[in-house]
Amino acid sequence: MKRIRIRFTFLLFNAVLFIFRDAGLIFEFYAVCLLHELGHLAALKLTGGELRMVELSGIGIRITASPAADIKRGAAVLLSGPAVNLLMYALLSFSGNSGRLAELSLAAGLFNLLPFSSLDGGALLDMLAEGSPHERLIQSVLKAVRIGIILILACFAVRCACISLCV
């Protein structure tokens, strides 16, 4: 049974987004998100998977599907969203349209490849580790990498905040 669930946080996120009132940015943001999710859905269809639910929340869109028949099919579905974003970036850049839409596409593609479980890259790493004789070790290493990324981003954010306050 296919269902669509819309969380309150999705509506709240949209309200905040519309405060910016830059219609172009809003359109480009949703175009990038839509293309990303269509990439997942196309791969799901091509690999014989079945869509079960789409959930919209303030932290993103989650697609729940039937379990992948094998790791290759699961990987194809997980990587197809970021691949569409990166392909869109390449096409726009090579055609001379390296503006905001291209930048948003690149950012979405790279962001979704980060090794966090709620993102495509992390879900792929978790899927590859599952059932491995070294699963606990792999998960521990991934946890350390995730903490490292958070610390680096936090330091970068603090540095940027200090620079903008000093200017």
Model-identified regions with their sequence ranges:
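Hydrophobic transmembrane alpha-helices and their immediate loop junctions
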Residues: 1-167
